[in-house]
UniProtKB/Swiss-Prot annotation:
Belongs to the class I-like SAM-binding methyltransferase superfamily. rRNA adenine N(6)-methyltransferase family. RsmA subfamily. InterPro entries: KsgA/Erm, rRNA_Ade_diMease-like_C, rRNA_Ade_Mease_Trfase_CS, rRNA_Ade_methylase_Trfase_N, rRNA_adenine_dimethylase, SAM-dependent_MTases_sf. Signal peptide: none annotated. One of its GO terms (molecular function) is 16S rRNA (adenine(1518)-N(6)/adenine(1519)-N(6))-dimethyltransferase activity. It is an enzyme of class 2 (transferase). It is found in: Cytoplasm. It comes from Cronobacter sakazakii (strain ATCC BAA-894) (Enterobacter sakazakii). It comes from the Bacteria. S-adenosyl-L-methionine binds at N18, L20, G45, E66, D91, N113. The lineage of its organism: Bacteria, Pseudomonadati, Pseudomonadota, Gammaproteobacteria, Enterobacterales. Specifically dimethylates two adjacent adenosines (A1518 and A1519) in the loop of a conserved hairpin near the 3'-end of 16S rRNA in the 30S particle. May play a critical role in biogenesis of 30S subunits. This is Ribosomal RNA small subunit methyltransferase A.
Length: 273
């Protein structure tokens, strides 16, 4: 028996497909999402409709984004969901969620069992549209959820942690074992809720600087900040910001990264490095 086949569909490795089939887990996720009629609900990667059906039952209209042409076609002809669905057969990484929010006339509520092979880049894509998003609920690798919620001084803390927490309140919801899927993935999974901040707790003047700083610092996470960011910060400047130059990237809080980005915005280096 081929354990990659579920409901007559062969799971495609290149799309990172693992289909949710545990009813308790499905009910728990739908309860956490709590979809209501009139809301702009958007599902990424509906697959074989494990979440689409119970969410769609509560709604008059549901927008879905599905890259797999065969699965998009199945949804189009779904016996009771079909008429409710607006289907975008495309890669979610190419979706303009700001434009979609304008079209739907309100902030989006985004959810999905995300393909694990694109979950991190998709998170960064969605962060650029947080002003158009009310909240997000995603099934992800447990390791990715751990990184999203991690605080300083932990191995899981990294660039994803800083950027996610800059944009959103991050709330773990549920842990999910591999047996809840067909085919079962080789890793544990978890559901997370991301609620964009109405106002960032630590506003930055230029987001590109926060992105650049976190990239440079965490690309050399074993180095001290004095060394990894020495091209833009002198030890004296770091000390004046209340940051020990001997600290490493994983020791610096979200607030401190934002403080550093704002210093750079006000005091740009004479030459871009």
């Amino acid at each position: 028996m081929n354990n990659r086949v579920h409901q007559g569909h062969l799971a495609r490795k290149r799309f990172g497909q693992n289909f949710l089939n545990d009813q308790f887990v499905i009910d728990s996720i739908v309860s956490a999402i709590n979809p209501q009629k009139g809301q702009a609900m958007v599902e990424i990667g509906p697959g074989l409709a494990a979440l689409t059906e119970p969410v769609g039952e509560r709604l008059d209209q549901l927008t879905v984004i599905e890259l797999d042409r065969d699965l998009a076609a199945r949804l189009q002809t779904h016996p009771f969901l079909g008429p409710k669905l607006t289907i975008y057969q495309q890669d979610a990484m190419t979706m303009d969620f700001g434009e979609l929010s304008q079209k739907m006339g309100q902030p989006l509520r985004v959810f999905g069992n995300l393909p694990y092979n694109i979950s991190t880049p998709l998170m960064f894509h969605l962060f650029s549209y947080t002003d158009a998003i009310a909240d997000m609920h995603f099934m992800l690798q447990k390791e990715v959820v751990n990184r999203l919620v991690a605080g300083p001084n932990s191995k899981a803390y990294g660039r994803l942690s800083v950027m996610a927490q800059y944009f959103c309140q991050v709330i773990p919801v549920l842990e999910v074992p591999p047996t809840a899927f067909t085919p079962p993935p080789k890793v544990d999974s978890a559901v997370v809720r991301l609620v964009p901040h109405a106002t960032p707790p630590h506003p930055v003047k230029e987001l590109r600087l926060l992105s650049r700083l976190t990239t440079e610092a965490f690309n050399q996470r074993r180095k001290t900040i004095r060394n990894s960011l020495g091209n833009v910060f002198s030890p004296e400047v770091l000390t004046s910001l209340g940051i020990d130059p001997a600290m490493r990237a994983e020791n610096i809080s979200v607030a401190q990264y934002c403080q550093m980005a704002n210093y750079l915005a006000d005091n740009p280096p004479s030459k871009e490095s």
